[in-house]
């Protein structure tokens, strides 16, 4: 279904959603630890619910309320249900694949039509190199995995997805030998590896770093029960900040920022480079935006989810925005580079599509348009924000926001947006 968006102004105090990446990691690690491990401020979205259900299929006993969950009992071999549906969640299927390789039972992992187009081969090859049997068609889901991996030395390319490395890191301490992990090529999305290691540390497991983002060793260890509080999601915060830059008036964003590493926090630096004044207190963020932004060249190799919220700011820049080193954004839920180039051109932004990014330039010919988000949650949200700036826009596939920000439309309308589901 589509939404109609009219020109809007946002004001008031909004709460930023909890972090999706940390919610995923904490749910998996709490399920490996068990013993009443608790996660506070967890994000309940389609993707994280897929992770909760995957852990239940692995045998974990999980209780949840509106903002938290408790894992009573951990993942157990004798309770495993041998088929896991990760829905649309790449993080779920990739981390679950590593966990599946720890067991001798054959486990099938699959997902929706979009997930079945996302690459898994580098991870499957790595798991097979240490003893797993992995069966797939062209290295994509559905896949069948049979363990048991024993550990040892593993090499894996880092230029496809950091989720492959996170999967190996998480399963490594539960192997007999531990894992010596060698990352080939240039690693993309480095901060997500930092997030994985930080979450593991919170659950009592240490990772020895020999060369950052290149060589790690994880000895045999046991995950320990703990209480973990999920911080705000800087990926969602970036979208709210772009909304504030384009459409905000006394718009205040609240949330527990915390001190865990998040690569997307660089968006604050990006906004300041563009000429936006950003004020960050312990639990609230506000922006003061000039009438026109500066433009500039931005390397998003470590923060691919910032591509959509940065791209739409080209509507307000004096000079072009050039986004580079984000080729891996083509391997997200959609080819975000191609879709942004195509759809932003409809509203009058001058777009040049590059293999690894975009060059975006403002124009005098902005206009409303019908925008196709291709069921990508982040594209839907930023196209709505563009619609608030321009007026007279429609955007397809509003259901996609269930993946990361289920209340997006309700929240935006509460604070002044004019978004109508058609």
Name the predicted role of every residue range.
Residues 1-422:
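Short, structured segments at the rim of ligand-binding sites
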């Amino acid at each position: 279904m589509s939404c109609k968006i009219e020109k809007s102004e946002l004001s008031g105090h909004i709460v930023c959603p909890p972090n999706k990446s940390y919610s995923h990691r904490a749910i998996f690690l709490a399920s490996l630890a068990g013993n009443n491990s608790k996660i506070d401020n967890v994000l309940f979205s389609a993707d994280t619910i897929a992770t909760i259900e995957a852990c239940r299929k692995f045998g974990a006993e999980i209780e949840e309320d509106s903002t938290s969950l408790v894992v009573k009992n951990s993942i157990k071999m004798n309770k495993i249900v041998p088929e896991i549906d990760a829905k649309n969640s790449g993080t779920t299927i990739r981390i679950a694949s590593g966990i599946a390789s720890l067991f001798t039972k054959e486990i099938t992992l699959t997902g929706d039509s979009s997930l079945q187009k996302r690459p898994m081969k580098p991870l499957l090859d790595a798991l097979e190199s240490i003893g797993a049997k992995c069966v797939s068609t062209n290295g994509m889901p559905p896949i069948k995995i049979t363990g048991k991996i024993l550990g040892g030395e593993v090499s894996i390319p880092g230029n496809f997805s950091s989720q492959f490395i996170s999967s190996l890191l998480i399963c490594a301490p539960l192997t007999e030998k531990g894992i010596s992990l060698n990352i080939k090529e240039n690693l993309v999305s480095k901060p997500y590896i930092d997030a994985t290691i930080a979450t593991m540390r919170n659950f009592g497991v240490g990772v020895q770093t020999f060369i950052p983002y290149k060589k790690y060793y994880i000895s045999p260890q046991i995950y320990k029960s703990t209480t973990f509080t999920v911080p705000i999601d800087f990926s969602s915060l970036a979208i709210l900040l772009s909304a504030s830059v384009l459409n905000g008036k006394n718009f205040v964003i609240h949330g527990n920022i915390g001190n865990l590493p998040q690569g997307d926090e660089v968006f604050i630096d990006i906004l300041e480079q563009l000429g936006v004044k950003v004020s960050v207190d312990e639990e609230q963020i506000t922006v003061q935006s000039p009438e026109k932004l500066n433009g500039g060249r931005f390397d998003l190799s470590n923060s691919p989810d910032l591509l959509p919220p940065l791209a739409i700011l080209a509507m307000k820049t004096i000079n072009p925005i050039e986004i580079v080193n984000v080729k891996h954004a083509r391997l997200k839920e959609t080819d975000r580079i191609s879709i942004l180039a195509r759809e932003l051109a409809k509203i009058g932004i001058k777009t040049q599509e590059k293999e690894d990014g975009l060059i975006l330039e403002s124009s005098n010919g902005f206009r409303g348009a019908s925008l196709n988000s291709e069921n990508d949650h982040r594209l839907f949200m930023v196209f709505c924000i563009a619609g608030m700036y321009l007026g007279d826009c429609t955007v397809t596939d509003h259901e996609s926001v269930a993946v990361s920000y289920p209340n997006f439309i309700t929240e935006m309308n509460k604070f002044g947006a004019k978004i109508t589901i058609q």
